[in-house]
Curated annotation (Swiss-Prot):
PANTHER family xrefs: F-ACTIN-CAPPING PROTEIN SUBUNIT ALPHA
Purpose: F-actin-capping proteins bind in a Ca(2+)-independent manner to the fast growing ends of actin filaments (barbed end) thereby blocking the exchange of subunits at these ends. Unlike other capping proteins (such as gelsolin and severin), these proteins do not sever actin filaments.
Listed name of the protein: F-actin-capping protein subunit alpha
GO BP: any one term: barbed-end actin filament capping
SUPFAM superfamilies referenced in this protein's UniProt entry, alphabetically: Subunits of heterodimeric actin filament capping protein Capz
Pfam families membership: F-actin_cap_A (PF01267)
Membership in a protein family: Belongs to the F-actin-capping protein alpha subunit family.
Superkingdom: Eukaryota
InterPro entries per the UniProt record, alphabetical: CapZ_alpha, CapZ_alpha/beta, CapZ_alpha/beta_2, CapZ_alpha_1, F-actin_cap_asu_CS
Listed GO MF terms: actin filament binding
Length: 266
């Protein structure tokens, strides 16, 4: 019993630490290591929980999240296309679509908001972009996800922002996660919150707020990264020995004394 609880915790922790765009690889590795049917169920449960909590993009368009999860089934609601869909965790695709009429009231500006968010993504997100809107009368929530997945050059990145509009006010948070793993393993995480008041609840006002907020967040990321690079990384470099030569951490590590000792187990 205790070993089963321990396994659940370990699997959940590994899945939770998954870098952007690499969840399928982690899923395959865990499934290969934990080959029994019960353990496979443990992996799938951990992945479903991760997706519900953090949101995921399927078929490059559809977002699955706890905020658009259908209450009485395993499916998710696409409020824009008015459909239910399931997800294939391993192929990262949306499947098993069916027509659905949500039992919520849509704001009058909903269609215009869809149009403006589409244009916003085309203008500001250079790679994969998806969004979903969850209406509830005059209130609504928006999730925006931008991904840049460059496996050939060993880096993946994800931007996710979540906004809540209620009674003329808007609050949101953005998370940035970048993973670089060529001859090393570097991870950059950034989180920032924002809030404000809308002079009027319409599509233009909402998207303008999102645009301004995300521009400010982007500038803050650049400033924080420059400070990290110029201050902390620079101080770290001063603690390292000056060899006046580039260390090839891959092929030539054995040529250095420390590397030779490691290679030959001295």
């Amino acid at each position: 019993m205790s070993s089963s609880v321990g396994l659940d915790t370990i699997v959940s922790s590994l899945v939770k630490s998954s870098p952007p765009g690499e969840l399928d690889g982690i899923s395959q590795d865990l499934s290969a290591i934990l080959s029994s049917k019960s353990n496979s169920s443990t992996v799938n449960t951990a992945i479903e929980k991760y997706i519900n909590e953090n949101s995921g993009v399927f078929s490059s368009t559809y977002i699955a999240s706890k905020i658009n999860k259908h209450e009485s089934s395993t499916k998710y609601i696409d409020f824009i296309g008015k459909k239910l869909f399931n997800i294939d965790l391993h192929k990262q695709t949306a499947i098993d679509f069916e027509d659905y009429e949500p039992e919520v009231k849509y704001p009058a500006y909903f269609d215009e908001l869809v149009k403006k968010l589409t244009e916003y993504g085309e203008d500001h997100y250079p790679s994969k972009y998806a969004f979903t809107i969850v209406p509830d009368g005059s209130d609504l929530q928006i999730i925006i996800i931008g991904q840049k997945l460059n496996y050939e050059n060993f880096y993946t990145g994800l931007w996710k922002s979540h906004y809540k509009i209620k009674s003329g006010s808007i609050e949101g948070e953005a998370k940035l996660d970048i993973h670089y793993y060529e001859d090393g393993n570097v991870r950059l995480n950034f989180e920032e919150s924002t809030s404000g008041t809308l002079s009027s609840s319409n599509a233009s006002e909402i998207v303008n707020f999102i645009n301004n907020a995300e521009n400010e967040m982007t500038l803050k990321i650049v400033e924080d990264f420059n400070e990290l690079n110029q201050k902390y990384f620079k101080n770290l470099r001063r603690l390292l020995p000056v060899t006046r030569s580039k260390i090839n951490w891959g092929q030539a590590i054995g040529n250095y004394r420390l590397g030779s000792d490691v290679v030959h187990n001295k």
